[in-house]
Amino acid sequence: MPELIEQSKIISGNVCGLPQLHKLRQDNCGLYSHIRGIPISYGNVDLLTTGVRAFVEEGIALCQPDQVHICDGSEQENKVLIKSLLEAGTIVPLPKYDNCWLARTNPADVARVESRTFICTERREETIPTPVEGVKGTLGNWISPSDMDAAVQQRFPGCMKGRTMYVVPFSMGPVGSPLSKIGIELTDSAYVVASMRIMTRMGAAVLRQLAKKEEFVRALHSVGAPANGQVEQPSWPCDPERTIILHKPAENLIVSYGSGYGGNSLLGKKCFALRIGSTIAKQEGWLAEHMLILGITDPKGEKKYITAAFPSACGKTNLAMLNPSLANYKVECVGDDIAWMKFDSQGVLRAINPENGFFGVAPGTSMETNPIAMNTVFKNTIFTNVASTSDGGVFWEGMESSLAPNVQITDWLGKPWTKDSGKPAAHPNSRFCTPAAQCPIIDEAWEDPAGVPISAMLFGGRRPAGVPLIYEARDWTHGVFIGAAMRSEATAAAEHKGKVIMHDPFAMRPFFGYNFGDYVAHWLSMEKRGQVPKIFHVNWFRKSAEGKFMWPGYGENSRVLEWILRRVNGESCYVDSAIGHIPAEGALNLDGMKDKVDVKEIFSLPKEFWSQEVKDIRTYFESQVGADLPASIYQQLDELSSRVDNL
């Protein structure tokens, strides 16, 4: 990163690529309450390991905070944070619930910013495939080391003047688990600290773990301030014009500026758990994936664990918290968003949820769609950009049936709202940040340091036409091809364009930490490392010619999981098809279903549709990935093409 003062130079052993400035380096003179001459407002500097302390000192030199707060994760500390957030007007209390708070952000800071999210490597091709000339690449953004340095130099010097720098030690995964990794985030946002306390294992226990083995990901975050010095909303400072999120995998470094929104500021989540996580996983021979993890127990008491990768708005959280309609089946939740998976010494693929909470999209969550989530979120939760009610509660689209009469609603912008307002009360990307341990169906092994054994992996998306309810990959390579070819319906940014089918390989398109072609090769290599699970593709969203969903979804999805369990147990309850194994006639248990399902139609494979699908996948692979895609994936596409020709 940039040199900030004349003749400063980066010395060997620099822990994070931030400048180590010889002129400014000084001993702390044994003072407990200062670090580099900056007062410690909370916490004990003696708990910092050598590497953490060096990182903090570099952050102080760069950002120039007024004081430093070393987080311990305690209840007492949380009260201090909540008090400061209340005083700043960042949050308001929700007296209807137990220890719940509502934050309203600057309206310009409401979501992840893909166009400003970069991976920094020496060579561009390490980060992204080279698309065909004239085609815009969609598999990540690369930035050179010199441009990253310049971006930091333009934004960070002095950005924490007048503010507190919080030192946030956090563990992704149970503290001490062989599958876990540690991070240190430096931030000037108390909202981030309070949220990280929910989303990660945060505090003194992490520093004690680092004292045993000092390996950690460095994460630097500032909400920033506009270059003109005018803060629009003092309760939510940010700098939307200059927001940037940078990752440097070679140095396990994340740098984020200008946004307080969760995906850009809670750096343990997508930045660490997926982007940096996937690069570490490649080096160490494991997988860091955008997947839920659930446990399902059949009527005989036999339990299996399944992971599933779906793009956003395709029901990951709903499946992770499934309430099965099939009698005597039980689903339990290990995680709803991210899975880290590694083979154990016996070659069994084991997964942990590296997170400690749920950062879920609120709108659409209701007692009808996800009663388990609704029974999770109304205590110890930070809500962001949902609407509030006059009786001290919250509201979002989907909660209409639970509204008491005569309750007034204030929308996410702080304005009065009625159902005739013509716009949503809650922002479409509004969130709840809630502890996972509160989930009524949290799995008993959700914090098992060894992880849970994975028997099946699901890929899926929102496909209104052509794609059957469920099919199984023929083998591992075919399964990897299915993941690479994933597509899902998304609403185009411009409404008049209507719905478009977007490519979202492995549901990871915004989160790859390195070249997608190398990522696919890494997935293919897993077969040589241990016992790989079976792979399936599901589609809950196929529609009839009349535009009605052909499958009722929600609890009825347990019927699909039952068939998956039968296949995992080796039952030959399938027939082969052009695209993979589908349930044999009568093999999908439909007993007792209220809705009549046209089984023939929901498993039909229209030749015209699949011929076009093959063409679209080929165009995507050739234009976006080209020679970087392993030859065996092109071979899978050729084989699919010839099978479709014979439909």
Swiss-Prot record:
Residues annotated as catalytic: 314
Signal peptide as annotated in the record: none
UniProt cofactor(s): Mn(2+)
Zinc keyword on record: no
This protein's GO CC annotations: cytosol
InterPro entries attached to this UniProt entry: PEP_carboxykin_GTP_CS, PEP_carboxykinase_C, PEP_carboxykinase_GTP, PEP_carboxykinase_GTP_C, PEP_carboxykinase_GTP_N, PEP_carboxykinase_N
Alphabetic keyword roster: Decarboxylase, Gluconeogenesis, GTP-binding, Lyase, Manganese, Metal-binding, Nucleotide-binding
Record: residues binding GTP: 313-318, 431, 462, 554-557
Involved pathway(s): Carbohydrate biosynthesis; gluconeogenesis
EC number(s) reported in the record: 4.1.1.32
GO-annotated biological processes: cellular response to glucose stimulus; gluconeogenesis; glycerol biosynthetic process; glycerol biosynthetic process from pyruvate; oxaloacetate metabolic process; propionate catabolic process; response to lipid; response to starvation
The protein's assembly and partners: Monomer.
Function per UniProt: Catalyzes the conversion of oxaloacetate (OAA) to phosphoenolpyruvate (PEP), the rate-limiting step in the metabolic pathway that produces glucose from lactate and other precursors derived from the citric acid cycle.
Stated name of the protein: Phosphoenolpyruvate carboxykinase [GTP]
Source organism of this protein record: Drosophila melanogaster (Fruit fly)
Gene that encodes it: Pepck1
